[in-house]
Amino acid sequence: MFSETHSDSQRADRILASIRREEARPGRGLLKIFFGMAPGVGKTCAMLEAAIQAADKGVRVIIGVAESHGREDTMRLIGRLPRLPMKKMVYRGVEMEEFDLEEALRVKPQLILVDELAHTNVPGMRHRKRYQDVEDLLAAGIDVYTTLNVQHLESRSDTVHDITAAPVQETVPDSVLAEADCIQLVDITPDQLRTRLREGKVYSAPQASAALDHFFKESNLTALRELALRIVAEKVDHELTEVRTISGDRSIWRSGERLMVAVGPSPFSARLVRWTRRMAYALNAPWIALSVDTGVPLPPE
């Protein structure tokens, strides 16, 4: 009885939350997050390319802030869109530049690009965090494109620290990701990212060399990539569950994914089974473990 009541309550909460979001939608901007496992995967370029496509279709686009980090490809894309002047601030005797929220609200484009969602603003700005600036833009009816790395997601920062041993100073609440209208995963393989580092396309040579041996070790990147993929899969699954609940017809929303893991005498079999089970849970998919017996005795070693 308890489980049934609890399930009904959860279903009601989901429907109510959806209704509230729909009621709040008129006049509110849309948020799209370009999400990746680490710096250098191409989030800013993907955001700029999507914005250029929107501008070509007649959307009034402006860059609020886009960080090139000296990367030529990024700078070329930035040059193809109008850009809002940065706001100059003096902090502890040093002149710094920040996103000018007030000017963005005055200009009020249809779409604005605000890079590095987890950024902490200089003291004296309207908000302490950039994601709070984004909230004001959305409330004003402006669509926003932004970027985020997995290590900056609040609930995963400890996990990332355990993986990389690198402290995470800036985080974004999970609610920001949960309420985003669209998340685009920007994904490359760990080997491709390490190649970009060696070619100087992410950091300068001395910094890149140190990064390859620490944060950007292949094992770290593989774990971060799995984490990013899992987060996006979980969000898609939650959205699908919500739609199925509201529709009242679960049968037409079956995604069809099934997972199979092949196991054998390898010492890694247990780890493979655990990984498959986690992925099946994230995808809400059935899974099986398969072992093939060829009838041939295994060698002594």
PLM regions with names:
Residues 208-216, 220-260, 297-301:
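Long, charged amphipathic helices and adjacent flexible linkers at domain junctions
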Residues 28-100, 106:
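Conserved P-loop
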Residues 146-210, 214-217:
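Internal gly/pro-rich beta-alpha loop/helix module
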Residues 129-149:
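Substrate-engagement module of ASCE P-loop NTPases
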Residues 116-131, 155-158:
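Conserved ATPase-coupling elements of RecA-like P-loop NTPase cores
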Residues 1-34, 229:
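Extreme N-terminal, non-catalytic leader segments
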Residues 60, 108-111, 140-146:
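Loop/turn-to-beta-strand initiation segments
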Residues 250-301:
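Small/aliphatic-rich secondary-structure junction motif
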